[in-house]
Amino acid sequence: MREVAIIGYAQSPQIRQETVCNEVEILMPEIDKALTDAGMTMSDIDFVCSGSCDYIAGGAFSFVGAVDSLGATPCKMESHVEMDAAWALYEAWIKIQAGEIKTALIYGFGKSSVGQLPDVMSQQLDPYYLAPLWPDTISLAALQANVLVQSGRYNETDFANVVVESRRNAKANNNAQLAGDVSAADLLKAPYISSPLRKHDCCPITDGASVLILGEKSALPDNGKRAAVIRGMDHRMEVHQLGLRELANSISTAQAMAQVKDQSGIAVEQYDIAELYAPFSPQTLILKDALGLTDKTHINPSGGPLAGHIMMSAGLDRFGMSLRAIQNGADRALVHATSGPCLQHNLLAAVEGV
């Protein structure tokens, strides 16, 4: 495989509600910051790919407006995925492996505060049997959490401990929405919003945007910083019908992990950090088990999605945060992104600092 590296990243502050700027205005400064971080200009970029959701923006082909943030010139080959921008990164990675391009700029954005995100995401469900019932994402995640509790592996205290660690880690992340020291005992006093989930178990509504620069390593400039080379990447999807899945286990994640291990040659115990896209606290535990992670690997040093969750960019942020961790001393990072209800579709990547 061609050696593809992540070299630049920028993220807007993850705030609860952006009342002044629209999506383009949020995105524009982050593009400049990411290019500066990489030591590049738009003239150095061969391909642009984005991830967003028309249902969140409330308009068809809303991503076209975001192209304005790239500038009128120079013209660029552009593409879009109607899902998390982590899959936009995957599209760019494939193009680089195929020799079509050398460099790419990836971005994702979302203003979840303008709509009802838990209801909007029900459009990902089976259109014949589930979507017409309008089950929201929190209720579905609670269903999954109940299955996990009934398995006897974890309980609500374990869920709260995930949040405690997330908030503690997020204190080092200036862009995090939720950060600070909390205790599991205090968290467990909060009322349920959908048993066994409480508000803190759910990712916060967040407005923002993120931008990432990657390319074939030989074509990238030396910006004086460590780069994050993608040693392996794979994604797997499970069946659409929830009743046919083992909700307490993420089979697709385990399958993707096996492929990434074969590609990268990196054993699970060699990862210093893991950035996991788990929008609900029980899902962190499900992913940890599926990946075989131990306490040797620091999970979500950025705080993860429970500290800030830009819809359609949270998966891309896991890649960006892995770059930041590598630039701060980590050697290897495991990156995870998800799409669909209850961890239906999972993408994994092995990233190594050079």
Role assignments for model-derived ranges:
Residues 3-19:
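Generic N-terminal amphipathic, Lys/Arg-enriched alpha-helix
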Residues 104-152:
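Flexible glycine-/small-residue-enriched beta->alpha junction loops
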Residues 20-21, 28-29, 35, 54-105, ...:
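Claisen-condensing/thiolase-fold acyl-transfer catalytic domains that form or cleave C-C bonds
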Residues 42-43, 154-158, 173-179, 226-227, ...:
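Flexible, glycine/charged-enriched surface loops at secondary-structure junctions
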Residues 112-116, 167-173, 342-343:
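Short, well-ordered, mixed-charge alpha-helical segments that flank or form enzyme active sites
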Residues 135-196:
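Glycine-rich, mobile lid/loop segments that gate access to catalytic sites or pores
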Residues 33-44:
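Signal peptide-proximal N-terminal region
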Residues 41, 50-57:
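Short active-site-proximal "capping" loops at secondary-structure junctions
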